[in-house]
Amino acid sequence: MTDLKQFIKQEAVAIIAFIVAIISCIFVPVTNYVSYIDTDLIGVMFGFMAVVAGFSVNNVFKVLSEQVAALAKDTRNLALALVFMVFFMSMLITNDVALIAFIPFTVMMYEKIDKSPVYVIVLQTIAANMGSAFTPFGNPQNLYLFSASKMTSSEFFSLTLPVTAVSMLMLFIGCMMIKKEPIFLEKDEQKATVQNPKYLLLYAALFILCILSVFNVVDTISVFASVCVVV
């Protein structure tokens, strides 16, 4: 009984949402639910997730992180590099994936220089959300809105570009508030290397196909089938 109470307390929001969903079923015919499933959207999301997972498994993001961080010679430039790496990558690989891919590296880097990573991680979180808002495939919400609204590419980017520009400025200001201190990083003999580089061009081609399917240049079923065959 105690475990049940603890579960209800921890998952209160999920339980309430489930109950409300069940109640809503009374007012909507069951036959309508099938029409809610957007198979094209699910197919595109699967394609992006599978391809990004391929990049991740082959250490692409680790190598990118190390190369970007190596350019920084002080704490401020390190923050700029890490924050804007997440900002721009989230436009392509979605906000949550960008955070999962790069925050562990940020924590590791700040442990090496004996500094707290909290402020930079907060900026990275903001960067991931604001950067992902720029493209139709930056996050699932954008993907759905772009698909459902039938907007043209120019209409979509005319809405997101001003927000993205302001976000970049605010993130830059946030990074500039960090005190500039020199950092000295020992060369790591066990640098990350890209695994199976021969597959990277294939993954890149699939990623481009996924993007083209968002803009209805390529059929979603063809992309889904291609990803399934390769991955």
Describe the predicted segments one by one.
Residues 90-100, 117-149, 171-175:
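Alpha-helical transmembrane segments and, especially, the helix-loop junctions at the ends
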Residues 76-81, 112-123, 151-162:
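Membrane-interface alpha-helices at helix entry/exit sites of multi-pass transporters
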Residues 2-4, 154-202:
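Juxtamembrane and boundary regions of transmembrane helices in multi-pass small-molecule transporters
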Residues 10, 14, 40-42, 75-83, ...:
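Residue-level signature of transmembrane alpha-helical entry/exit and packing/kink sites
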Residues 33-116:
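Membrane-embedded alpha-helical segments and adjacent helix-loop junctions characteristic
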Residues 36, 65, 207-231:
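Transmembrane helical segments that form the transport core of multi-pass membrane transport proteins
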Residues 28-37, 62-67, 142-155, 183-189:
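Membrane-interface helix termini and inter-helical loops of multi-pass transporters
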Residues 19, 46, 84, 88, ...:
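Generic alpha-helical transmembrane segments of integral inner-membrane proteins
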